[in-house]
Structure formats: C-alpha cells, structure tokens
Amino acid sequence: MTMKIFNVMSVVLVLLSGISTGVGADPLDTLMKKFEEGKYSKKGADTCIMCHKRSDKVMAIFDSVHGQANSKSPMAGLQCEACHGPQGKHKGKNEPMVTFGESSPLTAEMQNSVCTACHNDTSRVAWHTSLHAEQDVSCVSCHQLHVTKDPVLVKDQLVEVCSECHISAKADMNKRSSHPLKWGDMTCSDCHNPHGSMSDSALNEIDVNQTCFECHAEKRGPFLWEHAPVMENCANCHDAHGSVNEALLKSRVPMLCKQCHANDGHAGTAPGDNSSIQTGGQGCLNCHGQIHGSNHPSGKAFQF
C-alpha cells in the first residue's frame, strides 16, 4: 500500500510540474507545493470527518470499496489524502486539493493518474492509448466513487452508463433485431473493454470475428467450403448494435447478397424470367442456407 501511495503522488507531481503559468495556474501551483512539502494530516480521515461528516455524499465513501478497512483500500494508508492529496493545512474551500469531475482544476489526465496508480492491472494496460483517454474522458465520467455500488459495475446498469455518451448505439439496440442488451442478458463489456485494448473499437478479442465467435461458436468453422466475406469480417453483413432487418443484417436479402454477386443472371433462371431484385421473388437463402460456411458435398453453393 505504501508503494501505491508513493506512485500516486509521484505521478501527480510529474503532471503538475509540467503546468505553465497562466490563467487558473495559481491553485495548481499551490497544490504542487503541498505535494512537495508532503504535510499530511496527523489524524488522517478523522480530521476530514470533523467537517465533512455533515455531507452524506462524502460519508458514503465508507460504504464503498475505497472506504473498507483492508490492505487494498486507501483507508489502510493515507486514507482520504491518498486520493485527494496532502491536506495538513486545509483551511476550507479556498485550499486547493485533488478533486474529481468537471469542476476539478486538474485535467482528465491528471485525475486519471491518481486512479491508475492503484488500478493498473492488465485489463487497463491499454488505457493511455484508448479512445476514451484521447477524448479526455476521466474515470469519474463513468465511475462513481462515494457509493455503495458503482453503477458501471452493476450488470443491469452498465448499458445505461455507456448510453449516456454512445447515443447512436442505444438507438440501434432498440431496432427490430439487436443483441439482448436492453433485457440485461448482455452488457457492453461483453464485447468491449472500456479501458482500451489492442484491437479496433476496444474489442475484448483480437478482431471482430473472434469477438463474435465467443458466443456464435458454430460459425467459427473450419469449413470445407468457406464464404470469404464471413471469414474476413462479420461486420461486412451485420450491424452489431442493431438493425431494422432481421438477424442484424445491414440490408435485406437478396439486396445484401447482390452487393457482391452482380445481377448478371443465375444458374437455373430461364431466359426472360423476371430477374429484378425487388420484384423477381428471389430468395438467396432458400437454396444457400449455410451461408456462413459448409461441409456439404454441394461445394461452394453453401447448401444444406
């Protein structure tokens, strides 16, 4: 725990030291000086509680994981000051301190450095190159600290937290066909790592297909006859977050199929027959039922 506290203060000091003077710099300069002096309260959290006990939001920390009396909690070390910085000379609202949220004098990167000094396991190793970090999203943009249950860690509340920013994805999951997120059978984190990953779109797996195969294993193969678009990317045909078409398809069959298979005639279609996609009554899947791949003797026709 001592090493974690040292890491927190070291990271914050480095970030603060890079701040240039200018508008709003004075509080940060004062805060950096407090870190350099390292004057922490002699009574720890007891000093803070003397005034802040009137605030339910502050006292709720003791119902959260951060307020538990164990070796992994800030309460085992510098307590409140482990996150909020040294407050040995705290004189009320005018005294600069490490705070979190939009009203904080610290940038999102500085705020996050306090959290990542302790929360630095392998699931967060790609945070600094993640889209969230690049967009200056802070940890508290998603997480709530002084609460018994952080909503983002509760399965049936996670989707709502993500949807506050990802509005288009929320709209998609209410379309005709979608993954069962709105019923609580899935969450966004089943496919995505919000803390970043080495894959596109912060996927948990190496690519789109491997992510899909985690649930749709029957589509993985290997197949004797493979369908190239399927093996390349499931997203060639499907909208993962939802679609107005059945089976999450980007467009209806046969229009979807015709994007690759040009309308230049088809075996078994008599000359003069109506070959229109819209009015010809074409149904590709009537014959080509194993479109994800097949081991059937019919070969690349992908039949049953």
Sequence positions of predicted segments:
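Positively charged n-region of N-terminal signal peptides that target proteins for export
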Residues: M1-V8
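Bacterial N-terminal signal peptides
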Residues: M9-G18
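Short sequence/structural segments immediately N-terminal
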Residues: G22-F304
